């Protein structure tokens, strides 16, 4: 999968990310990856479910879900563990 078919989830409203995913599929992407970490994980799940069940129903399916942990440095020099998720949506043939 090409790196340009990735939507990174942040603090914006969910519908902004839904529109970004739908735009990727409308431009011909076979797969779109939704990535998030920390508190944005629930928003990433919401985006995937809204795209799959409301906008592109019977057109898009979940290919795989990857979860993990990243070690991020803090301001005082220590490291903290942050959860990550990647949801890969694929267009049905």
UniProtKB/Swiss-Prot annotation:
Subcellular location(s): the record lists: Cytoplasm; Chromosome
Sites bearing N6-acetyllysine, chain numbering? 11
Q: How is it modified after translation?
A: Acetylated. Acetylation at Lys-11 decreases DNA-binding affinity.
Where on the tree of life does the source sit, at the highest rank?
Answer: Archaea
- Please provide, alphabetically and separated by semicolons, the GO molecular function terms listed in this UniProt record: double-stranded DNA binding; RNA binding
Q: What does this protein do?
A: Binds double-stranded DNA tightly but without sequence specificity. Involved in DNA compaction.
What's the name of the protein? DNA/RNA-binding protein Alba
- Supply the source organism for this entry: Pyrococcus furiosus (strain ATCC 43587 / DSM 3638 / JCM 8422 / Vc1)
